[in-house]
């Protein structure tokens, strides 16, 4: 039996999640499948119990190891941006808490998910929580800058930390017709960008100003 309360009570109840979804709609999230995923995924199990009462605030929260769980609006925006069409094979760079992974897995446009994380303790924690939710993904302790070349190419790639420049390996692993969603920049400013792979090359679109932890090379 899982040690996680997936249903939640009080500040982690379904009613509280539904209020969050209403706020996301007010902020411009329109994909009903994304809104349903945000309503159904129990964000409170992906953060420390001491912060569970803040799980459904629209804010980022610390998850240890110098990392954060992204604010729900950002998770919803990135999911909506990636899932504009079916994506049979999706690579997530930066598993983190596993929350974004779970939201992706809840979207019907997403097929098989491969997720890499450079911090071993986060891989272990995310794996435990995703298993409790019966979410089936392939996790790997690996350097996100390198992607997952053995499993590419991917129809969708979503990066949950900000590189100064997009790693070439990720562009190489993007299939024709595929979409890469990635925040790019430094602590002084980041922009959420879309890279669409077409028969003629890459089309790049800037979406919004964002704030992510930096994408770091190497393993820990």
Predicted regions and their residues:
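Class I SAM-dependent transferase core
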Residues: 1-91, 99-102, 107, 122-133, ...
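Conserved nucleotide-cofactor-binding alpha/beta core module
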Residues: 83-203
């Amino acid at each position: 039996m899982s040690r996680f309360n997936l249903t939640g009570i009080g500040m982690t109840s379904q009613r509280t999640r539904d209020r969050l979804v209403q706020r996301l709609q007010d902020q411009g999230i329109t994909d009903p499948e994304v809104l349903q995923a945000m309503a159904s995924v129990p964000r409170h199990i992906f953060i420390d119990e001491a912060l569970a009462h803040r799980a459904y605030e629209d804010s980022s929260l610390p998850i240890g190891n110098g990392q954060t769980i992204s604010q729900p609006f950002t998770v919803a925006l990135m999911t909506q941006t990636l899932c504009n069409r079916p994506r049979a094979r999706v690579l997530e760079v930066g598993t983190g808490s596993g929350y974004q992974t779970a939201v992706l897995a809840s979207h019907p446009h997403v097929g098989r998910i491969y997720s890499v994380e450079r911090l071993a303790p986060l891989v272990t924690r995310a794996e435990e929580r995703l298993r409790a939710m019966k979410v089936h993904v392939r996790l790997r302790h690996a350097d996100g800058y390198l992607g997952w070349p053995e499993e590419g190419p991917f129809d969708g790639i979503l990066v949950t930390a900000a590189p100064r420049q997009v790693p070439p390996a990720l562009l190489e692993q993007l299939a024709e017709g595929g979409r890469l969603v990635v925040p790019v920049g430094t602590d002084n400013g980041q922009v959420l960008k879309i890279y669409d792979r077409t028969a003629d090359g890459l089309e790049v679109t800037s979406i919004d100003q964002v704030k992510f932890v930096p994408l770091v090379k190497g393993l820990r």
